[in-house]
Design a protein with these regions (language model features):
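Non-heme Fe(II) oxygenase catalytic core, chiefly the N-lobe of the double-stranded beta-helix
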Residues: 2-185
């Protein structure tokens, strides 16, 4: 799929996933043509990056997210104090240090997740993405037939299944933040 971008600069960064977008200030009042092209790049590349957006604050992030669609709050984790939709994560606690998908255990799952690094570590802190569409498309036909015949229960119960080796204080803090509501689709 090829698209002729007129309002943003799109530089692919991987064979099957990812592009860096430049020539746009996400904190500004973006014109509809720019928003449409950002959406097109998201569809085409699955993961898009905007570097150097230091001027973007919580209000700007929420405004940008709303231009891409209706923001969806995490059903079991409260939003950041003073925001409508932002889920604040930090490097402590290892809450997302395994392969996962964001909120896909609910019936009407989000189109995308928007991450904004406010303070990045000098080393580590890497986030990795996978293109499951490309993975499926490159399966041998026999495995596609098998995959198409399978059914599964998708749930967030894993979030509560294991007891991590954390202190009592950390566990209490975790329970303050997370609501132990299980979803299943």
């Amino acid at each position: 799929m090829s698209y002729n971008y007129q309002h943003i600069i799109v530089k692919p960064i991987g064979g099957r996933i990812g592009a860096e977008i430049s020539g746009v200030d996400l904190s500004s009042n973006l014109v509809e043509d720019v928003v449409n092209e950002i959406n097109q790049a998201l569809l085409q590349y699955k993961t898009i990056f905007f570097k150097g957006q230091h001027q973007l604050d919580d209000i700007g992030q929420e405004a940008f997210a709303a231009r891409l669609g209706t923001p969806l709050n995490h059903p079991t984790v409260p939003t950041k104090k003073g925001s409508n939709h932002i889920l604040e994560l930090d490097s402590r606690g290892g809450r997302a240090d395994t392969w996962h998908t964001d909120i896909t255990f609910i019936e009407n799952y989000p189109k995308a997740s928007i991450l904004r690094s406010v303070i990045a570590p000098e080393v580590g802190g890497d986030t990795v993405w996978a293109n499951t569409t490309a993975a499926y498309e490159h399966l041998p036909e026999s495995l596609k037939v098998l995959a198409d015949s399978l059914r599964a229960v998708h749930s967030n119960s894993y979030d509560y299944a294991a007891s991590a080796s954390i202190t009592t204080e950390q566990r209490e803090k975790y329970r303050e933040i997370f609501t132990a509501t299980e979803y299943e689709t």
